[in-house]
């Protein structure tokens, strides 16, 4: 998975989980947590890439 895409997926999955906390079905939770897990694994696999610094 492309590093930039992985960052985007991680951000979107995290935002969705936070915005919909308490109102999601079990399936929605599993899908979004799985996407977040795969994205974070991809980011970790690219650990030689320096993450951009946030302001």
Specify the residue positions occupied by each region the protein language model found.
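Short, charge-rich amphipathic interface segments used for partner binding and complex assembly
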Residues: 8-55
């Amino acid at each position: 998975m492309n590093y930039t895409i992985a960052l985007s997926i991680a951000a979107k999955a995290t935002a969705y989980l936070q915005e919909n906390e308490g109102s999601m079905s079990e399936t929605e939770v599993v899908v979004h947590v799985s996407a977040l897990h795969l994205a974070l694994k991809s980011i970790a696999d690219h650990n030689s890439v320096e993450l951009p610094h946030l302001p």
